[in-house]
Structure formats: structure tokens, C-alpha cells
Amino acid sequence: MLDIRFVRANPDAIREDLKKRNDMEKLAWIDDLLVQDIRHRELIGQTNELRRRRNSISYDINRAKKAGEDASALIAEAAGLPGRIKENEAEMEEISKKIRYYLMRIPNILHESVPVGADDTQNVEVKRYGTPRTFTFELKNHGQLAADNDWADFERATKTSGAGFYFLKGNLVLLDLALQRFSLDILMEKGYTPIIPPYMINRKSYEEVTDLDDFEKVMYKIEDDDAYLIATSEHPMAAMYQDEIFEEKDLPLRLAGLSPCFRREIGSHGLDTKGLFRVHQFHKVEQFVYCHPDDSWTIHEELRENAEEIFQKLEIPYRVVNICTGDIGTVAAKKYDIEAWMPRENEYREVVSCSNCTTYQAVRLNIRVRDKEDFESKQFVHTLNSTAIATSRAMRAILENNQQEDGSVVIPKVLRPYMNDKEFL
């Protein structure tokens, strides 16, 4: 969320950002937020003064009595102080809830390079890599390839677990594991520490990491424990250092999270209804970085380049798009998507999301860095995240781009050492 001090100093900048996002409903929130903030600070001052008076009035009463003076007015004042303090505290609590409600939902400040647009049709292409292959035979979609070769069983998974699940079998299990290890090896060479996070996260932490209004509908909730199965390892990694202070020398901290991801709402998109692209459960390697604010825009490009390197080495054609103001969501200040070429649909589809969240998560989570020149000075860190590989989507891209007329699939050269040097699935 935004720091209330930033809101006080920059209300016009926030209003302009909301207009770029076409989020007109929240414009009125800014005025009310500032009014509530002023009242809240007034109440703090008044309540502190009442507490000081409560502590000192006993002395005044005793002094009056010793002097033979009438202390009835002081006694009456003292009797009323607890009630006045309680009233102020109750009002402060209500105002605090309202302020937090606003701050948790007003989106991050956009970077100046984010294109203005209404929706995903106005995202801006940044670059393309590779040339889509020309096929001389009728293409199969990845789900058909997997079923025909007994690499996956969608029908039995539907019986056991419902739509959107799958059994991976044989070669696709090995391909999934190869993609995980391949991407981890690339990141480890670049100084990223592998992390296997908890697969559940409690509600308090989730509320600090993301906007639950947007995200809760896609998550599996464990009711008895007020916890959730994680939708991405980004979330537990972001909450990992909540309420802690980094030393500047320890940043940037680069993490590579490996986990299954669980998502309830998957939607449908033409040929996705049976297959690996939109599913309730998949494996993902996620890049996550805590860094000093001065470094975050350089690191944002680093994360994108890391993800691009993975798809380049897999020899999958892709494009990079800069996500526009109407499609970027609440948390990110800037976001790239990498979209891989899917020949069966004859279009690019998202396989990587790469975001700089600046201080938005860190303010909620109270994660700061101490200034190396001034021990008492601290500021909020920046957090960044990017997909390295979502294996189900990468497998779809490999199956469709590398399929052969006989139904076999060429294994990317970089994955062969992880698959007993086999050339074909």
C-alpha cells in the first residue's frame, strides 16, 4: 500500500495516476482519506493531552485538598477523563479502519514508462524473439498430443478432482522436472538462492502481500485454519521478512522460489478447456528480489532478461509487452509480460509476468533497509517478482512448437541433459 506520508504530500499525483488507470471511483477516496487523516491526527493530539491531564490531575486534587480549597471541580473533571479518552479511542479506531481500507486499495504509483491504455488490447509490444515455425502438416493441440502419447490423463483427473486438473505421466513428468531444474540452475548461476516456501499462508500475511479483494476469489481457502493454499511462491517470499530491517550491505537479496501453485478460478479460452494452460494446479519457479530503492529499476530489467534467457535457450519464439495502465493491476508500478508463440492458436500467449512493486508490498509488510551512512535512518525496501518458468505453460509451448508429423516432440537441447540425453518425447 502507499505510505500515508506520501499521500499527504502527493495527492494530485495519485489523482492523475487514478485517471490514467481509469479508476474514477477512487478519486473521491483521496479527498476523504485526507480529511480522515487530519481528524485522526487531531484525535491523537487530543487524546495524548487527555492522558497527560489524567496523570497530572491527581496531583492537582491532592494539592487543593491540602490547601483547604474546593476540589470538587477537579474531581468532576477527573471522573470525566476516562470516558472522553475512551470516546476518542473508539473514534480513532473507526477512522484507522477507514484509512487502512483506502490505503489497502488505492493502487501503486505507476512508472512514467507505463503506456496509457484502457485494457489488454492496448498493451505495447517491446520486442520479439525468434521466428515462428512453418508447419507442413496439420497441427495437434498440446492436450491432444499429451493424450495420444499417454503423457497426461485429463479424463481420469476430472473424475478424481474435477475439471482443470490433470495426471502427468511418463515423459511429461520428466519434462516438468527438467524445466524446474533447468531454470533453477540458470538463476543459481546468477546468485539467486533456491527457496521451497510453505504451501499455505495465513490470512494476515496474504492481506499484506496482495489485494485480497482481487485475489481471494482465485485462491483455495482452508477454513478451519484461516489460511490459503498459495497461488504463487511470490506471496510467501514477500511475507518472509515482514517486520524486519535489512542492512544495506545485505541487499539485493535474490530468491528463486519453487512451488506448486493452486488457483480456483481458471476461466476458459477456446482451446484451453482441456490441457495445461489454464489449470488449478501447476509448478512454477519464481524470481523474487528485495532491494534498495535506488536499484529496483535496473533489477526489474534483470528479471525480464533472466526470463527471456530461459525461453531463448528453450528456442521458443516470444514477444515482450509493456502492460498498460488499464491492465496492470493494483500492486505493480510497472509490469512486463512475456508471451510465447502458440502455433495451434496462431497467437502469442502469456507465460511470464514480471513486476516492480516498488514499496507497495514493503509498506504493508513493514520491511525496511537501514541507511549505511546513518544508522538511525531507515526506508522501505523495493520488492520485485517475475516468473522464471511456469512449467505447464512452458510444456504447452514446447509440445506445440516442437511437434513432429509422427506425433513425437523434439526435446529442447538445453533440457536433454536433464532427460537422459533423449532427443524426442
From Swiss-Prot:
- Which locations, inside or outside the cell, does it occupy? Cytoplasm
Q: Where does L-serine bind?
A: T232, S233, E234, E286, T387
Q: Which reaction does it catalyse?
A: tRNA(Ser) + L-serine + ATP = L-seryl-tRNA(Ser) + AMP + diphosphate + H(+); tRNA(Sec) + L-serine + ATP = L-seryl-tRNA(Sec) + AMP + diphosphate + H(+)
Q: Which GO terms describe its cellular component?
A: cytoplasm
Q: Which UniProt keywords are given for this protein, alphabetically ordered? A: Aminoacyl-tRNA synthetase, ATP-binding, Cytoplasm, Ligase, Nucleotide-binding, Protein biosynthesis
Q: What class of enzyme is it?
A: ligase
Pfam families according to UniProt: Seryl_tRNA_N, tRNA-synt_2b
Q: Which Gene3D superfamilies match?
A: Bira Bifunctional Protein, Domain 2 (3.30.930.10), Serine-tRNA synthetase, tRNA binding domain (1.10.287.40)
Q: Please name the GO terms that the record assigns under molecular function.
A: ATP binding; serine-tRNA ligase activity
Enzyme Commission identifier(s): 6.1.1.11
Binding of ATP, residues: R263, R264, E265, V279, E350, V351, V352, S353
Per the record, the pathway is: Aminoacyl-tRNA biosynthesis; selenocysteinyl-tRNA(Sec) biosynthesis; L-seryl-tRNA(Sec) from L-serine and tRNA(Sec): step 1/1
BP terms from Gene Ontology: selenocysteine biosynthetic process; seryl-tRNA aminoacylation
Job of this protein: Catalyzes the attachment of serine to tRNA(Ser). Is also able to aminoacylate tRNA(Sec) with serine, to form the misacylated tRNA L-seryl-tRNA(Sec), which will be further converted into selenocysteinyl-tRNA(Sec).
What is the annotated quaternary arrangement, including any partners?
Homodimer. The tRNA molecule binds across the dimer.
Q: Would you identify the family this protein belongs to, as annotated?
A: Belongs to the class-II aminoacyl-tRNA synthetase family. Type-1 seryl-tRNA synthetase subfamily.
User: What free text does the record give on domains?
Assistant: Consists of two distinct domains, a catalytic core and a N-terminal extension that is involved in tRNA binding.
Could you tell me what this protein is called?
Answer: Serine--tRNA ligase
| Species per Swiss-Prot/TrEMBL record | Methanospirillum hungatei JF-1 (strain ATCC 27890 / DSM 864 / NBRC 100397 / JF-1)
Lineage, please?
A: Archaea, Methanobacteriati, Methanobacteriota, Stenosarchaea group, Methanomicrobia
